[in-house]
Amino acid sequence: MARIKVHELRQKTKAELLNQLKDLKAELALLRVAKVTGGAPNKLSKIKVVRLSIAQVLTVISQKQKLALREAYKNKKFLPLDLRPKKTRAIRRRLTKHQQSLKTEREKKKEMYFPMRKYAIKV
């Protein structure tokens, strides 16, 4: 089997991808049997290509699933943890911009009664 092009995989449906994955795994099993029984060298070198193809198919499947989940949770209030932006732990714990801008009643009154003084410079 020749190497698979990923852009072709992206065009396929999930059922087609799962069928292809099953075929590739079956082929890999045959190649491993050939390796144990002392098969031809060209079959041994094919193992690497088939394993790569399996990885590519699995990657495309998982990417499609994640994309579908993102669409499903698009306008929801809460997101599953794996769909949230990674960031660092410290950044995730920080206050939001809104929380930082909030002021107590006392602060509001103080600013209202004692505003910043404005000075005009005579030239």
Curated annotation (Swiss-Prot):
Taxonomic lineage of the native organism: Eukaryota, Viridiplantae, Streptophyta, Embryophyta, Tracheophyta
GO biological process per UniProt: maturation of LSU-rRNA from tricistronic rRNA transcript (SSU-rRNA, 5.8S rRNA, LSU-rRNA); translation
UniProt entry keywords in alphabetical sequence: Ribonucleoprotein, Ribosomal protein
Matching PANTHER family: 60S RIBOSOMAL PROTEIN L35, LARGE RIBOSOMAL SUBUNIT PROTEIN UL29-RELATED
Annotated GO MF terms: mRNA binding; structural constituent of ribosome
Family, similarity comment: Belongs to the universal ribosomal protein uL29 family.
Pfam families in UniProt: Ribosomal_L29 (PF00831)
Gene it is expressed from: RPL35
InterPro entries from the UniProt entry: Ribosomal_uL29, Ribosomal_uL29_euk, Ribosomal_uL29_sf
SS bond partners: none
HAMAP family the record matches: Ribosomal_uL29 (MF_00374)
Name of the molecule in the record: Large ribosomal subunit protein uL29
Annotated source species: Euphorbia esula
GO cellular component: cytosolic large ribosomal subunit
